[in-house]
C-alpha cells in the first residue's frame, strides 16, 4: 500500500462519472455474457484453450522459427525486437524511410505496452487510433481502462462531449449518432494514411498468418488501405495451426463482449493478398505493398523461463477477468492497472515494465478468484499474485510491522493468545453494550467508518473448549474442529454451536489444542517462511488423533489447509505427503452435516425467509456451492437467491485494512443485493464474511441478521 495508490483509489471512488459508467456498462456486459454462454460447454472449451496455450508456449522456439519462415515466404519482413525501445526504433525508422506523415492504428495492447504511438508522435508523425474506444481515450489524453473496452470508464455524456469537440459538431447522447460522427471523422484518415499499424490476436505458425479480430471493421481498413502495414506482435500470440486458432475463436468474443463470434476476422498472409480460405491464397486481392511484422520480447522470454509465472503468457487478452473483478468494478483499470489491467496486469507489469508498478497494482487484489473462474485459458491469477508478493518480499523484504505481526506474533500461538487478550482489555473504552465497536481512535477510524467491528472475546474459543481437546473413545466419527483466528477470538459462540450441532448429528467432535493460525495472512503477504512454519504446526496438531475428518467454519482457512499447504511443503516430500493426507479430510460445516445425516427428512416450513451469500473461498476455493442451500432447505427455511450471490463481500486479501474505502465500495453492492431479496436473515458459511456483512449492515442500521448455518441449526435443536 502507498499513499499515492490510496489517493488514486479515493479519486476513482468519488468520481461520479466513473461510477456511473462502470455501473451501466459492467451490468450490461454481465447480462450479454450470460446469454452468450447459454448452452456452451465452457469447461471443455477452456480446457482445450489451456492445452493449446501450454503446448504453444512449451514449443515456442520452434513455432517462432516456423512462423518466421512461412511469413518470409509470403513476402513479409519479420523483425525481432528485444525490447520496447528496439521495436519503436524499427517502426520509426521504417516510417521515416517511407516518408510517412499519417498513420492509422488499429487496437493493440502491445502498442500501448511499448508506447509506440507516443514515440511516433514525438517524431512529428500523426497517428490516429481507429478503434472507437481507443480514439475516445486518445481524444481524452488518457490510457485505456480495459483490455478490450478502452473507454469503458467514460459515460455517454463524456463521450458525446469529446466527439463533439473533435468533429466541431454539437452532438447529443444518441449512441448511433455518435458512432456515425466518429466514422465520418475517421474515414478520411484511412484514405490519407501512408502506414497502418495493428496488433494481432493470433499468429499462425503453419502459414505465417496474422489474425486480427475487430467489431468495427477498422482493423480491415487499417491493414489494407495504407501501402505499408506494420504489425507489432508478442511472441506469446503464436500458435501452431488454424485448428488452434479456431478453438480460441470459440470463446474469445464470448469472453470479451458477450458475442458468439467476432464481427470481423482478418487473416493476413503477406502483402497484397489474403488467406480468406485457409490454405488457398488469393493473389491480387488488394492490400498493402509491404507487410512488416515486429515480434516483441520485452520480457516475454524471461517470463517463459519461470515456472511460477509462465502461465501469464497463456492470456488471450479477452478481458473476461476484468468483467467479473469486484475491484475493477469499483475503480476501473486506470487505477487497477498500469498498462495492462487487473490481476493479470500486475503479473505482466512485473515482467514487461516494473516490479514497483506491479506491486502497487497487486496490492488491490481481493483474492476472490472470480478471475480464475472466468478465464478461458484457466489461468490461476490469484496464485500468481501470491507468488509475486512472495518474490517481492524475498527481494525487498517485508515492512517492519508485517515482520513483527507475522514472524514474531502470528508464528507463535501463545504470543498471539497473549496479544489478543491484551487487546480484549484495551478495546473496552470503544465497545458498545451490544459488543460492537463502531468507532476507533486515530487512523484506525478509517476501518470503523466502513464497518462496525465485533469486540474481541474475553474468553476465546480455546478456553471454552478445554474439555474437548481430544475425542472420547466411541464408535462415532471423530471430527477435528479447526476454527481459524476470527472464530476463535471474535465469534467463539459460533464455534460452540458447531460442536453442539455435530454432537446432535452423531459425531464425536473435538478441538485440537495445538492448532494455530492457518498462516493465510502471512502467506498472502509473501511471508512464506512463517506460513510454512504454521503449516507444519497445524498438520501435526490436526493429524495427531487420527480424525476421520476435519471441519472448518472459515473457507479461507479450509482453502489454505487443503491447497496451499501442498504448495508450501512441495520441497519436503514427507511433509507434503502428510499435507496431502490432511487435505483429503477437510470438510465445510454444511458438507459434513449432510454427510453425517444423509437420511434426514425435510422438515416442515419454518416460515422464515433467508438468503445465502457464497463465500469466495468456499465456492471457488474448495468447490462447495449447493450443500449450504440443501441444508437450509432441508431444515425448512425458504432460501431467496440474491443477485450475484457469489460476488465478493470486500473482506478479502489485505484490502479491508489497506484500502477500507475500496472494501466499502465492494461491500455496498453486496448489501444492496441482500436487501433487495426481502430476506430476514443472510446466511453464510464464512466467519470473515460474517464480520464484514454484520459490520456493514450495522452501519446501515439494518434489521437484517447475519448468521452462520451452525448458529441457525443450533437454535433449532
Residue ranges and their predicted role:
Residues 1-307:
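The feature marks the mature, well-folded catalytic cores of soluble enzymes
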Residues 40-42, 90-97, 107-194, 201-204, ...:
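Iron-sulfur cluster-binding electron-transfer modules in prokaryotic oxidoreductases
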Residues 77, 81-82, 255-266, 322, ...:
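Flexible, glycine/charged-enriched surface loops at secondary-structure junctions
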Residues 228, 264, 288-291, 310, ...:
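Active-site lining segments that contact anionic ligands and/or coordinate catalytic metals
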Residues 230, 307-313, 346-358, 369-376, ...:
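Short beta-alpha connecting loops at secondary-structure transitions
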Residues 295-318, 345-368, 662, 672:
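Ferredoxin-like iron-sulfur electron-transfer modules
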Residues 312-318, 322, 362-372, 515, ...:
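Residues immediately within or flanking Cys/His clusters that coordinate Zn2+
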Residues 320-347, 364, 370-391, 560-562, ...:
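Iron-sulfur cluster-binding cysteine motifs and their immediate structural context
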